[in-house]
């Protein structure tokens, strides 16, 4: 999925340089959504690593 975020970011940069407003806006929008998703996942994994995965299992019981 990170691969798609990079692809859409590159497409939006190229389309923006060439002046294709609609294509650039669409690709940039998708890239922003994927970036936000990965940012949230990174924060979740950092918290899990700080607490230890065992803490999550104990809380679910």
From Swiss-Prot:
Cellular location(s): Cell membrane
Residue intervals passing through the bilayer: 5-25, 33-53
Main localization category: membrane
Source lineage: Bacteria, Pseudomonadati, Pseudomonadota, Betaproteobacteria, Burkholderiales
Keyword presence, Membrane: yes
Family, per entry: Belongs to the UPF0391 family.
UniProt KW keywords: Cell membrane, Membrane, Transmembrane, Transmembrane helix
Pfam families assigned to the protein according to its UniProt record, in alphabetical order: DUF1328
Aminoacyl-tRNA synthetase as UniProt keyword: no
A GO term from the CC aspect: plasma membrane
Protein's recorded name: UPF0391 membrane protein Bpro_0066
Membrane topology, from the record: Multi-pass membrane protein
């Amino acid at each position: 999925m990170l691969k798609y975020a990079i692809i859409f970011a590159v497409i939006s940069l190229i389309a923006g340089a060439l002046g294709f407003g609609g294509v650039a806006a669409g690709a940039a929008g998708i890239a922003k959504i994927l970036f936000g998703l990965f940012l949230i996942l990174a924060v979740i994994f950092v918290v899990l690593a700080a607490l230890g995965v065992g803490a999550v299992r104990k809380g679910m019981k």
